[in-house]
């Protein structure tokens, strides 16, 4: 429930842009970022400003070239984004903050249960791999998400929309064993009811089916959590469609959106 106290904690009017990192959020994030190199040229721009620029692109949906002039140059900002992408830093930050936020909530750092689902989104003329989702009549890409039972993103994948859920779930489940090896059970809808999904890993896949008398939309147990996560990250206009030329960049923006959610939550609790 919104109260004057909660509104104050969520208020971002004091920042230059709503996407900028507050002092509390920067204190949460800074220890996990790569330190400056001891050799070579010094950084011309503070890392905090670089991340503010990246989050501005994510939140506003603007092209890199249209960054406001008080941010670092768009070439520099994009280069740091791709460096973080190629080094796996977005995924690493998400992993660290998921564990910290679970501990903050009194949970074990690594989850034992998760939920998976996908979302098909349209692409643009930027190119790159894409396909046609015949079920949802969408030409573009499919975002696959595995979240814990509170809705924190554990593993995120992007692939052409023509890949069926049961095929896209296999690499998602396999990837989860490296970062979250204690997941024992995954809840999913009937699209994942296939032998290849059940035998992909040692994880038990439990199918949450519609109610026998269900007509139209209904909130289903477990499954609504991943739907809520997808709705949260879609508030970022860069994710309204898939504008990226590569699957790697598309995935990196998903992790960046998850990181933004987690650091705000951790900062408010600190």
Q: Model regions: which residues?
A:
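Short alpha-helical elements
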Residues: 1-270
């Amino acid at each position: 429930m919104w109260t004057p106290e909660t509104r104050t904690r969520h208020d971002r009017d004091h920042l230059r842009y709503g996407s900028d990192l507050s002092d509390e959020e920067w204190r949460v994030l800074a220890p996990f970022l790569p330190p400056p190199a001891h050799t070579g040229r010094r950084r011309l721009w503070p890392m905090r400003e670089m991340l503010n620029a990246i989050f501005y692109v994510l939140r506003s949906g603007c092209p890199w070239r249209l960054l406001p002039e008080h941010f670092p140059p768009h070439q520099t900002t994009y280069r740091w984004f791709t460096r973080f992408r190629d080094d796996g830093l977005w995924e690493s930050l998400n992993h660290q903050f998921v564990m910290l936020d679970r501990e903050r909530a009194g949970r074990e750092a690594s989850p034992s249960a998760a939920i998976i689902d996908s979302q098909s989104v349209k692409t643009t003329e930027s190119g790159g791999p894409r396909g046609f989702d015949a079920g949802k009549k969408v030409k573009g890409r499919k975002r696959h998400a595995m979240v814990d039972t509170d809705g924190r993103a554990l593993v995120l994948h992007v692939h052409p929309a023509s890949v069926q859920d049961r095929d896209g779930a296999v690499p998602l489940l396999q990837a989860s064993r490296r970062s979250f090896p204690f997941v024992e059970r995954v809840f999913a809808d009937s699209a994942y009811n296939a032998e290849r999904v059940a035998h992909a890993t040692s994880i038990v896949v439990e199918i949450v089916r519609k109610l026998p008398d269900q007509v139209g939309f209904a909130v289903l147990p477990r499954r609504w959590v991943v739907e809520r996560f997808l709705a949260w990250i879609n508030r970022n206009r860069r994710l309204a469609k898939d504008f990226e030329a590569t699957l790697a960049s598309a995935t990196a923006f998903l992790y960046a959106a998850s990181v933004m959610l987690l650091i705000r939550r951790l900062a408010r609790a600190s």
